[in-house]
Amino acid sequence: MAKKSLIQREKKRQNLEKKYKILRNSLKKKITETSSLDEKWEFQKKLQSLPRNSAPTRLHRRCFLTGRPKANYRDFGLSRHLLREMAHACLLPGVTKSSW
């Protein structure tokens, strides 16, 4: 189980990313569309003034039950440990153990 503070930090980053997503995308679009170098510098400064944690690259996918940061499956939102346990317990519909 991950520390509660790390899980809360990740939730804070997700909220910041949602809050600044539209503004960040519009600034990036303006940077690519303008031809004037001075305007590009101005938009770039505005983009850099946004909070660092509002960038989507700062987000990290975590298991939503345990908060484990590594070995997560996107389709389920679970870590590999919980995916295996829940699949064996038939708690994930449509997931079967393969055998060949």
UniProtKB/Swiss-Prot annotation:
InterPro entries on file: Ribosomal_uS14 (IPR001209), Ribosomal_uS14_bac/plastid (IPR023036), Ribosomal_uS14_CS (IPR018271)
Any Pfam family the entry gives: Ribosomal_S14
Single Gene Ontology BP annotation: translation
UniProt keyword terms in alphabetical order: Chloroplast, Plastid, Ribonucleoprotein, Ribosomal protein, RNA-binding, rRNA-binding
GO cellular component, one term: ribosome
GO molecular function, one term: rRNA binding
Compartments where found: Plastid, Chloroplast
Main location: plastid
NCBIfam families assigned: PRK08881.1
Family the UniProt entry places it in: Belongs to the universal ribosomal protein uS14 family.
Free-text function comment from the UniProt entry: Binds 16S rRNA, required for the assembly of 30S particles.
Assembly mode: Part of the 30S ribosomal subunit.
HAMAP family, sorted: Ribosomal_uS14_1
Protein name, per record: Small ribosomal subunit protein uS14c
Organism: Marchantia polymorpha (Common liverwort)
